[in-house]
């Protein structure tokens, strides 16, 4: 969860528009997100390429939207798992909360840390854009 010092519409736009996603969607400063697409509709596809800046490793994150309530929340499925993202107005600030199904290969604490690091990058980017 992160509380972003920006109105909900700006936060929603920065979270869902590909030209913004590529600026914040990575957990470590040694990584980046060189490309992203987002078809924000039920059945639409979210895609983000994440890779190490030195080119040593990379992966594609793909998800399909199952629920969207514009400006409020969305749910998408990826690799047999689901994530739900909510946006709550806090009088000029916006709370963003990401709930996700963990995968089985890595400890849950490590997964939470990674998702939170990406959310922290998002907060920093949105507040300075």
What role is predicted for each listed range?
Residues 1, 8, 33, 45, ...:
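Intrinsic-disorder/low-complexity, polar/charged segments enriched in Ser/Thr/Lys/Arg/Asp/Glu/Gln
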Residues 1-5, 39, 49, 64, ...:
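Generic structural detector for well-ordered beta-strands
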Residues 1-31:
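Hydrophobic ligand-binding cavity/cleft-lining segments
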Residues 11-12, 21, 46-48, 65, ...:
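Hydrophobic pocket/interface hotspot
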Residues 26-35, 80-82:
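A short, amphipathic edge element
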Residues 32-76:
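Glycine-rich portal/gate segments that line the openings of hydrophobic small-molecule binding cavities
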Residues 72-118, 122-124:
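Beta-strand/loop substructures that line and gate deep hydrophobic ligand-binding cavities in soluble
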């Amino acid at each position: 969860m992160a509380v972003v010092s920006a109105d909900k519409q700006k936060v929603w736009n920065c979270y869902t528009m590909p030209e913004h996603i590529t600026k914040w969607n990575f957990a470590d400063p040694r990584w980046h997100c060189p490309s992203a697409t987002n078809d924000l509709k039920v059945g639409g596809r979210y895609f983000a390429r994440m890779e190490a800046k030195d080119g040593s490793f990379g992966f594609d994150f793909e998800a399909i939207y199952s629920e969207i309530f514009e400006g409020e929340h969305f749910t998408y499925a990826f690799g047999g798992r689901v994530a739900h993202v909510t946006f709550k107005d806090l009088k000029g600030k916006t709370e963003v909360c990401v709930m996700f199904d963990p995968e089985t290969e890595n400890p849950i604490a490590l997964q939470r840390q990674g998702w939170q690091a990406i959310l922290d990058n998002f907060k920093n980017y949105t507040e300075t854009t």
